[in-house]
Amino acid sequence: MCVQRALSQHNIDPTTIRGIGFDATCSLAVFSEDTDEPVPVTGPNFANDGNDRNVILWLDHRPVEEAKKINDTEHNLLRYLGGKMSIEMEIPKVLWLKNNMPPELFDRCKFYDLADALTHIATGNESRSYCSTVCKQGFVPVGVDGSVKGWQEDFYEAIGLGDLTKDNFKRMGGVDGVVSPLLTTTYDFQSSEFMLI
């Protein structure tokens, strides 16, 4: 609807547009897996009082202990992140939520990098980008250093997020060994429809 309105207001020929891209900071967005509604992540009680937000910004440094726990594993995938995972990445924030949220709420959450969340909001699909999953969520691309797994189940188990490996990493946006069955989305400006490619 927003795209259609922008095109109409500015008399832009839809055939001249080749794509729309989203960019965002390394922030974590959280939605309910069953209803797709935003899940409040501000804490401490996580009850939605109407003022809560479902995004933990990159500059939120609450997960100090969680980042330390992750880096203390010295897991091989950390080599691809400069030797350690930054507190500003999604995984320390997800682990912080697991350690602080009521378990029944955490168990219903699905997680996105903010740019991927914007794509999800715009399209309704569950695709994730390689940038988000590789650089911020512990996915090692198949073929890198002999990897054939992609998602690193042993890493998630070691840091206490083994429950996210169930359902083929669905809550993180993937299937076992693959980021997502369909990695990208396109918008058909002629028909005003989003399509998976």
Language model features with spans:
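N-terminal glycine/serine-rich phosphate-binding loop of ATP-dependent small-molecule kinases
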Residues: 1-45, 56, 79, 107, ...
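Generic structural signal for well-ordered secondary structure
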Residues: 21-23, 48, 63, 90
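Short, well-ordered, mixed-charge alpha-helical segments that flank or form enzyme active sites
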Residues: 28-30, 66, 119-121
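A glycine- and small-aliphatic-rich helix-loop capping segment at beta-alpha/alpha-beta transitions
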Residues: 32-47, 128, 147, 151, ...
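Metal-dependent phosphoesterase core characteristic of DEDDh/y 3'-5' exonuclease domains
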Residues: 49-58, 125, 129
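Short alpha-helix plus adjacent loop in nuclease-associated cores
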Residues: 52-70
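Gly/Ser/Thr-rich active-site cleft segment
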Residues: 61, 71-197
